[in-house]
C-alpha cells in the first residue's frame, strides 16, 4: 500500500472499548456487535465469545483483554474498520483497563437500565476521561420489567456529568439498538491521529504466551508501520527481537503483511518470557527508534501476599511449574519459594488484589489439579526500626523483634461504596469495625448514596467484601484504590501449641483488637485439634506476653478400674504413676495440627 492509501485507510479506523460494571451486559453487547458486523458466523457464535477462559465464563467476568477487528458498512455506504478492545471491569485489573483504554479513541459506557451507575463503572469512566476518550452512554437491558431509562439518564448526567440526551436505549440480549450504537461509533469516535511516516511507536496492552511462537504481543500502533522482518526494541528495557509475524484477531489470529498507524493487532517475535514484555510498554524499531516512549507506563506491584502450599508435599514441583505457566500470561503474578515448619515447602505469592488471588488459586486447582492450602493474606507493611533503618515486610514470620521496631506503617485505601439509602447505617458500622475513617458521603439520587472511607488494606483483604455484601443484601458496589501509608499500632501475634510457635498461624493485628482476635483463634483451635494423650495448652502471644490461653484436656485411661475398694495409698500410687507418664509424654510429644485448623483460622469470622 502506498502512503495515500494508508492515510485513507487510517481515516476509516475506529478504536473503541466497552466500559461497564460486572453484569451490566458488556460481553453480551460485544457478542451482538460481532454478530451484526458478521465477524463471526452464527455457527461459531457462543455466548461471551471474547471471554475465552472457562473461569471467565463461569464467574461472568472478563479477566484477560481481547482485541478484535471488525468491518462495518455504515449507512453512508463506506466500510469502516472497527477495533473492539474488551476490558476487564474489576478493580484488581484497573491498570490493565487503563492500558486498554489508552489504545482507544472512544468508549461505550454501558449502564444497566434497572440498576443505574455502580462504583466500578464510575472508576472506569474516570480512567476513560483521563485518556481523553469520546464517551458514548448506552442504557442497556431496557426490556427488563424494572427498567427505568429516564432515571438512569439523569443519573449519568448528574453523577458523571456526561450529556446523556443522545444515549442509545438498547437491549443487547434482544438485539435492540445495536445498529444505532454502530452508527454512533462511526459518527462520534474520532479516527486515530498518528503519523504513518514517523518512527514506530506501538503500545503493548496485553501479551499472551504461545508454546510455538513465544510471547505474542497485543499492540495498538500509534505511529509508523511494523512488518515481519523488522527488528523491534522494547523501550522500558532496551531488549531487541526479530519480528516473525504480525496480524489481527477476528477472534482467531489472522496473519497480515503489516500493521500501520491506528491498527490494533499482534506481533510475534519469538520473545521467551512475559517478564520482558510489560503491559503499557512501547515497542519501536531498533533501526529507527522513537525519541521517547508513550507516557503512562508503570510497573505493576502486587498489593496482597499469601503463602501457597500443596496439600501433598510431593506436588511441590508441579506447583512451581503451574505458577511459572500462569506467570507466562500474567506478569503481575509474583512468587518466590518459602518453607514453613508447619506446612512444608511452598511459595509466597504476590497478587494485585483479592479477585486476582482467587482467580489464580482457582486456576491452579482447576487447570493443574493441585490441592492447595493458602495462608492468611497479608499486605506490605513499612517497618521503621530503632536504628533508623526501614524495611518492607509482607510476611508475618519475617517481622523483626518487637524491641527493635520504632513504628509500623500500613497501607490505607480510599474505598468508595455505593449503596441504597436504607443500608447506609450497616455500611458505616462495618467500615468503623474495620478501623475505617469516614471521609464524605453524597446522594446520587433519592435512594442511592456514595460513601467514601479510608480503610486499612489489611482489613479489606480479610473478608470485607463478603461482609459488605451480606450486610447490604448484595446491593452495595465497591471500588478501592491505594491512597497512602499511615503509622498504626500494629503487633505480630503468634500462636503457640504446647509451647511451640506454629509459624503458618502468625498474623499481624491492630493492638486494640489483639485480645479478641487471639481469644477467638485459640477457642477455634481448641474445637478442631483432636485431644492427645497429654494436656495441650494453646496460647496466643504478642512477643513474650501471652494474651489468651485455653487447654485441650488429656485423654486418660481409668487406672483405678481394677482397684475394688482397697487402700487409698494404692490408688494414689497408680494415679501418680499415670501423671508422671503423661508428663514425660508431654515433654517429648508433638501435636499434629490437622489441615482444617489452618483453614479455619484463615476464615476467621467474628462470630
Curated annotation (Swiss-Prot):
Main location: membrane
Domain tr-type G: 11-193
Keyword Cytoplasm: no
GO biological process, one term: positive regulation of translation
Alphabetical list of PROSITE patterns matching this protein: G_TR_1, G_TR_2
Gene3D superfamilies per the UniProt record, alphabetical: 3.30.70.240, Elongation factor 4, C-terminal domain, Elongation Factor G (Translational Gtpase), domain 3, P-loop containing nucleotide triphosphate hydrolases, Translation factors
Recorded topology in the membrane: Peripheral membrane protein
Enzyme Commission identifier(s): 3.6.5.n1
InterPro entries: EF-4, EFG_III/V, EFG_V-like, EFTu-like_2, G_TR_CS, LepA_C_sf, LepA_CTD, LepA_IV
Any GO molecular function: translation elongation factor activity
GO CC, any one term: plasma membrane
Record keywords: Cell membrane, GTP-binding, Hydrolase, Membrane, Nucleotide-binding, Protein biosynthesis
Catalytic activity, as annotated: GTP + H2O = GDP + phosphate + H(+)
Pfam families to which the protein is assigned, alphabetical: EFG_C, GTP_EFTU, GTP_EFTU_D2, LepA_C
Binding locations of GTP: 23-28, 140-143
PANTHER family: TRANSLATION FACTOR GUF1 HOMOLOG, CHLOROPLASTIC, TRANSLATION FACTOR GUF1-RELATED
Protein family according to the UniProt entry: Belongs to the TRAFAC class translation factor GTPase superfamily. Classic translation factor GTPase family. LepA subfamily.
Protein purpose: Required for accurate and efficient protein synthesis under certain stress conditions. May act as a fidelity factor of the translation reaction, by catalyzing a one-codon backward translocation of tRNAs on improperly translocated ribosomes. Back-translocation proceeds from a post-translocation (POST) complex to a pre-translocation (PRE) complex, thus giving elongation factor G a second chance to translocate the tRNAs correctly. Binds to ribosomes in a GTP-dependent manner.
HAMAP family tied to this protein: LepA
Protein name in the entry: Elongation factor 4
Protein source organism: Streptococcus pneumoniae (strain Hungary19A-6)
